[in-house]
Every structure is written in C-alpha cells, then in structure tokens.
C-alpha cells in the first residue's frame, strides 16, 4: 500500500522551513565536508517514501544559495543549487546505536529525528526516548526482546537508565513513582491502528506480573493475565490495517506489590464497535471469537449449539475468514483455558458460547414483507426460518414468542389506549440487528464484570497503576460514526497530553516562580470544539436531528454546513456533500460519510426488548442488563449513543488526570505490515500527531522532574538523612540543604514556592548518590538488625526463665521421689 498524495501533502505542511544552516565560517567560506539535509532532490521526486536526502555543501556556496552534492542515498554526483530554506543542519559523526535518547542529538530538526529513528529501526532497535515519551516502532516481527530474561534484566539492574530504552523502562519508572512517592500512575499507550499498542500493553502487563519472591497469592494475578486473550478474542478483529485491531478501549487499574506481582485489578471497557457484529468491510473480519469458536469447537459443542461452517453465517463476511499467521483453533483452546482461569465454571462457559451461537443463528433469520394490518410491507419471519429463529432464541435463553412479538409488533399508546400495529420490514431488521448487537456487547461487559468481581480490592483503590490501551486515529475508505467516535477519543487524548506536558508546564513554572523560556506547542482545542462543544458542534447537531421529527442524515450534514461554515476545522466534501463532510484532525483531514449516522446514534435497545431479556430463566442472561434503567417512549436527550460516549470519555479523562502519566507512543513504519520497510511521510505525520516533535522542544527548555517538598523529602531523604530529619528547619529549606549537600550543580535544579524542580540528569545524580549511601549503610543496618533480634530473643528468654525454673524443680522433685 503506497503512500498517498494526500499524505505527502500533509507531511510537507508539517516541515518548518527556516534558514539556519551553520555551513559557513567567519570568513564566509564553507566548512570542509559540511553536511546538510534537504527536501530538494530527484530522488525524492522518484520515491514518495523519502522526504529528505543528505548532501555535502560545496565550496563557492553563498548564504543566499547553496550548491550541494547528494551522498545519502547516493546521488548522481552532479552539484545542484538549493535555497537555504530547504536545508537543515545534519548530525555528523553520530552513531544512533550508541545512545537511545533523541534529546541528546545536537540537532533535533525533523530530518535529523527521522534519520535517527530510521537507523535504529533498521538495526532492530525499535525503542527510543523522547522525554517524557517512549517511542516504539512496530517491527512486524519477533525480536526476542520481551522474554522473561529481558524482564529480569530491566527489573533487577541497579541503574536501569544505563540500559537501552524499552517499554520495560517505562514500566519500571512508573512502578518506582507509585511506590516511591505513593501516587497513582497511568501509562497511556497510543498510536494509529496497527502501530503495536496491544502488544506493548501486554508486555508491560507481563513486567508488572513478574515477582522477585514466590510468596504471592497468584490466584488474582492469574485471572488478570488470563483476561488478555479473552478480551482480545471478544474485542479485537482483523481490519485492513491490522490483523489484531482493538475495537474497544480498555482502562485497567492495578495494585502491584513492592516485590512485584499484581495483587488486585479492575478493567473498564468502552466504545465496543457494535456495527462490526452485523457487517464488515471487504478484507475484514468480525470479532475473533466467532471464528475461533466455529473452527475450534469440539463435536459435542457443534452438536449442542447446531454450529455450521464459517461461511454459512450471514453475520460473517464469507470473503475474509482467515488471517495469515493466525491459528483460530489454537487460539480457541487458549480462550477456553483463560475463561477457566478467570474462575468461570464449565456451566458459565457453556452459557457464554450458547449466547454467541444464538447471535450467529439469529443473524441467519430472514425477514420478509407481508400484506398485513393495513401495511403492504409488514414484517414477518420467513416460514422456513421459524425453526432457525426458535433455535436462536433457545440458545440465548429467550422466549421465542415474546422476542417474535417485540420484533414484529409495534405498540403505540394514544389517549391511554394501547394500539397494536406492525413494524415494516426495515424497522424489524433494525430491531433484530439491535438485539444481536446488544446481546454481544452486554455479554462482553458481563465477562468483564465477572472478572472484576474476582480481582477488585474490597476497599477500593487508594493508589493504583493505570493502563490505557486504546485504538488510535482511524482513516478508512469509508469513515462512519464509529471512526468519528474513535477519532474524537484520540483528539481528547491528544489534548490531554498537551494539557499535561505543555499547558501545565507553562502554568506550573509561572505559579511556582520558575523562569524558563516560553513553551510553544500545538493545540487541538479548535478541533475538539468543532466536534464536541455543547450546542454548536458536530455531535450536538447530530443529537438535534436524532430528536427532531423527520430528522435525516442529509439534514444533519446540512445543519453542520450551515452552522459551522465559519469554522476552518469543518468543510463540506467536494463529492456527495449532502452526506459527506471533512474534519481537519490533528493527523490531517479525514472525510466522513454520514450514511446511517442517525440510525447508529439511536441504537439503544427498546425497553420492552430489555424487559424480555431480563425475564430470561438463565441467571447470566438476566444479569446482562443489570443496573440499566429501562426507558420507554421517546428517546430522551442525553440517552443517545453520542451522549453516553462523551460522558464515559469525560469520566475517563478525569480519572487519568488524577494520576501521574507516562506515555508510550507507538509508530507504524509502513502500511504493508512488513519488517524493515520505512515510509517517511507516514512516520512524520505520526511524529507530529503524537507530539513527539514538541516533546523534544520541551526537553531542551524545562525541568522534567518535579515534586512537592514533602514528596522530595520522602524520596531523597537518604541523600542526607540528618538534613531531611532536622525538625528545626522548614521543608523548603530541608530540600535546599539536601541539594547543596549533594553537590548538585545549581543549573540542575530550581526551588519553587511549593516544589523542587530538577532536570532529568539532576534526578539521576541524586538517585545514584542515594543508592551509594544506602549501600554504605547496608552492613551497619545488618549489624543493628542482628543486635535488635538478639535483644528481643534475650527478652523473650528472660521472660520465660521463671516458668522454666518451676518446670526444672518439678522434674527434680519427681526424680528424687523415685
């Protein structure tokens, strides 16, 4: 899949063209062999994957015009002229493999960053640091760098900062802050679909699960780790861009032991893509579990559930049933084992797959139009499919007569009197599809609720390790409401990152009286407003049309075009503008097709159908809609899918904002899912969208470590314990004394009104000093500990001496008597 012209244009707009090359000495002559990057070259014109080439500036060049010869990739050797605004300084004589921190480069302009990442990627070094971020590039192959041995290496080494960057680095630092400062942490893993987010999350979970001691109760940890294959089976699917794409968002809260190992946890799932249950695009699959179940079920299951071949179910795309390199049968065995490890009984597991089979079977039921009740298109179930319908209801533990009535019979109330009519075929199809989607979604959420009931701490979470694994920006040929929600989520996450790393930095420095250069950053506030602002945004106009009599997809787009015409983040599409519109997202323009927007946004299962499900004789089915308020009649404002989505997203962001965040940015190097293939325009767009370039600016300007005086003293009291424990001195002065006594250069730190600010290198030095002090005291502590134990033992013995003497006297008396 080649890079598109639109992507090339988007990437080109990101490049900042300024004339600041340092090729000339004081006399105006060119430094011998001076190298630069340029975006002017026949090579670039012929290969869209390349954006910059390396050249040597030739003698005779002027500041107004540079004469260059291309050397990387090798050119023709013919000199040519370029404008200095198309030239960037180059990092000469730098070995990208000798260090993993982009911030240590002399020049961090765009071509230098791309070149640094490329060299490391081509040598299988996929992790790089851009403080406060870890950049992870998908290798599309197993590098063998996430084994248990690697986990022990990063977990047990005295100074992990000397090791190459890794997701384990992020995990260790987050754990250190969780236990060292006693403050909740969140690791946010983000990136485009197919960038490797799910894999990164799994490896971090494995790191947290590793324990230095074997004294832990592994029951809860086993259940948490077992949930991964189950959640992937029910929540992931093959898309055109990713063979294992997460089609839901997941936030986990974990309690991790000081010795390692997961003690408690909780999972929140949101935004499951329900439309995939009913239909999939070409070359895409529905959720993995359908294929795993149909291929991996044993003969008893197949007979009990009446299973057919994968291509015989209308809910599954018959043209895409296989995934290269994926063994659905083997994966099904793992899912069954994982469900057992989640403490689900054999009967529970049977109910789960009975419901899955029922959903697939209901999808095969055909509805027809019939002349009835004054309607020419009244809905009816095809006679030969009644057996299929009854079987589907039986598998889902639902009363077939009641379900049939809810799908076919329309009940209206006029003047307190119920009037029965018939749904037309289209309406009945919507109800049938809604039932399939609701049963699947609620089953998925029930599995998660069951898991949480086994793994959550009784008293709730005081401090926790948060893990956010969420789909990245999506741009398909046809982008619908699901993609809009996904992309809104990513814009919110982007804003969250900007708020945390840039706006908060500037405000914090100002509030604390710390002087530093002004931080400049890219804000996506305008995009958020055009998408979500109350009363005047895409989602608000969508809700208006859903609630208005006679609302249509076309009227929704027209309303947006009329009311948002002054906003440059929204533009009508050039083709089919009555249903298509374009949003200028952080990653570039994305066109949406509003076909079925209203239908999808109103996709709330009717209250009468919910009541039928809750009356099921099966306790698990009864619990599927547990806690859900049944609403009848007209749809209320705020109950639509879009409103529910925004409320859940707001709650998630509030929870994340209450923690200390860590960021892993996953990069997809190409669209072909091939190892060692590098597409610069695509990568640059991601570097920009994920704020990696801005993070490098922050690195040069700010203080990456900051703690309140109390937190600083808690963390670094052993640097000089006398200074830390001096009760006659205020906490602020205690911090100053510790810093001065440590010998740390004043350029490494600032003292604010309530906080200590340290540059990253300063924090490393303090940690090293404290570690050395603790090593010095280790022998002394051992001696004192032994003395205390001896004293306690002596006290215990002395306490028992009178009793022992009485026993001794009694024994002697007996012996004399004999």
UniProtKB/Swiss-Prot annotation:
MF term (GO), any: actin filament binding
GO biological process: actin filament organization
Domain of life: Eukaryota
Spans annotated as Actin-binding: 661-671
Keyword tags: Actin-binding, ATP-binding, Cell membrane, Membrane, Motor protein, Myosin, Nucleotide-binding, Phosphoprotein
Locations listed in the record: Cell membrane
InterPro entries: Kinesin_motor_dom_sf (IPR036961), Myosin_head_motor_dom-like (IPR001609), MYSc_Myo14 (IPR036044), P-loop_NTPase (IPR027417)
GO cellular component, one term: glideosome
Region (Tail): 773-818
Regions crossing the membrane: none
Domain remark from Swiss-Prot or TrEMBL: This protein differs from the typical myosin heavy chain structure in having head and tail domains but no discernible neck domain.
Protein name, per record: Myosin-A
Organism: Plasmodium falciparum (isolate 3D7)
Annotated gene: MyoA
């Amino acid at each position: 899949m080649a890079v598109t012209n639109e992507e090339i244009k988007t990437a080109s707009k990101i490049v900042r063209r300024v004339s600041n090359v340092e090729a000339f000495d004081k006399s105006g002559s060119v430094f011998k062999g001076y190298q630069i990057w340029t975006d002017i070259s026949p090579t670039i014109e012929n290969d869209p994957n390349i954006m910059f080439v390396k050249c040597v500036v030739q003698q005779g060049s002027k500041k107004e015009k540079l004469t260059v010869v291309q050397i990387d990739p090798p050119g023709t050797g013919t000199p040519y002229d370029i404008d200095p605004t198309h030239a960037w300084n180059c990092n000469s004589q730098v070995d990208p493999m000798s260090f993993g921190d982009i911030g240590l480069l002399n020049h961090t302009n765009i071509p230098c960053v791309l070149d640094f990442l490329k060299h490391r990627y081509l040598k299988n070094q996929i992790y790089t640091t851009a403080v406060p971020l870890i950049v992870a590039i998908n290798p599309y192959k197993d590098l063998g760098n996430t084994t248990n041995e690697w986990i022990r290496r990063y977990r047990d080494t005295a100074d992990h900062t000397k090791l190459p960057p890794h997701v384990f680095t992020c995990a260790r630092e987050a754990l250190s802050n969780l236990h060292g400062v006693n403050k909740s942490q969140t690791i946010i893993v983000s990136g485009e679909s197919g960038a490797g987010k799910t894999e990164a999350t799994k490896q971090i979970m494995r790191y947290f699960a590793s324990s230095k001691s074997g004294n832990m109760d592994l029951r809860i940890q086993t259940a948490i780790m077992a949930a991964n294959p189950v959640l992937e089976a029910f929540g992931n699917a093959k898309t055109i861009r990713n063979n294992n794409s997460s089609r839901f968002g997941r936030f986990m809260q974990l309690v991790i032991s000081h010795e390692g190992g997961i003690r408690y946890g909780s999972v929140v799932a949101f935004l499951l893509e329900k439309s995939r249950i009913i239909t999939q695009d070409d070359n895409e699959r529905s959720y993995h579990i359908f294929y795993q179940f149909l291929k991996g079920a044993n003969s008893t299951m197949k007979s009990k559930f009446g299973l057919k071949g994968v291509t015989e179910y209308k809910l599954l795309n018959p043209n895409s049933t296989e995934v290269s390199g994926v063994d659905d049968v083997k994966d099904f065995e793992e899912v069954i084992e994982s469900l057992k490890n989640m403490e689900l009984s054999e009967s529970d597991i049977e109910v789960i797959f009975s419901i899955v089979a029922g959903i697939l079977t209901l999808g095969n039921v055909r509805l027809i139009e019939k002349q009835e009740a004054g309607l020419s298109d009244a809905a009816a179930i095809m006679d030969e499919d009644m057996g299929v319908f009854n079987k589907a209801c039986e598998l889902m533990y639902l009363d077939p007569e009641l379900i049939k009535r809810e799908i076919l019979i329309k009940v209206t109330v006029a003047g307190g009197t119920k009037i029965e009519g018939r749904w037309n075929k289209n309406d009945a199809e919507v109800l049938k599809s809604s039932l399939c989607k609701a049963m699947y979604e609620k089953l998925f959420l029930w599995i998660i609720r069951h898991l949480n009931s086994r793994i959550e701490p009784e008293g709730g979470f005081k401090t926790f390790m948060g893990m956010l694994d969420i789909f990245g920006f999506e741009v398909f040929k046809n982008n619908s409401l699901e993609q809009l929600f996904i992309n809104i989520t990513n814009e919110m996450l982007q804003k969250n990152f900007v708020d945390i790393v840039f706006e908060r930095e500037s405000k914090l420095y100002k509030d604390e009286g710390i002087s530093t250069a002004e931080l400049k950053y890219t804000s996506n506030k305008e995009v958020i407003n055009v998408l979500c602002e109350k009363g005047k945004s895409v989602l608000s106009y969508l809700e208006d049309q859903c609630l208005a009599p006679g609302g249509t997809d076309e009227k929704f787009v027209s309303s947006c075009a009329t009311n948002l015409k002054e906003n440059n983040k929204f533009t009508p599409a050039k083709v089919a503008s009555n249903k298509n519109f374009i949003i200028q997202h952080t990653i570039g323009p994305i066109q949406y097709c509003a076909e079925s927007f209203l239908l999808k946004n109103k996709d709330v299962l009717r209250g009468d159908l919910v009541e039928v499900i809750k009356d099921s004789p099966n306790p698990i089915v009864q619990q599927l809609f547990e806690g859900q308020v049944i609403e009848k009649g007209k749809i209320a404002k705020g109950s639509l899918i879009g409103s529910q989505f925004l409320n859940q997203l707001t709650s998630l962001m509030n929870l994340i904002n209450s923690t200390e965040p860590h960021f892993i940015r996953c990069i997809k190097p190409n669209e072909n899912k091939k190892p060692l293939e590098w597409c610069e325009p695509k990568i640059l767009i991601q570097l920009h969208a994920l704020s990696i370039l801005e993070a490098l600016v922050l690195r040069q300007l700010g203080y990456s470590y900051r703690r309140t005086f109390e937190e600083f003293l808690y963390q670094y009291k052993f640097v000089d314990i006398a200074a830390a424990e001096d009760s006659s001195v205020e906490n602020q002065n205690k911090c100053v004394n510790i810093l001065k006594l440590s010998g740390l250069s004043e350029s490494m730190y600032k003292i604010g009104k309530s906080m200590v600010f340290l540059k990253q290198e300063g924090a490393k030095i303090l940690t090293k000093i404290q570690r050395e002090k603790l090593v010095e005291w280790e022998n002394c502590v051992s001696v004192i500990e032994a003395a205390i134990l001896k004293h306690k033992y002596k006290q215990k013995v002395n306490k028992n001496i009178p009793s022992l003497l009485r026993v001794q006297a009694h024994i002697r008396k007996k012996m004399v008597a004999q």
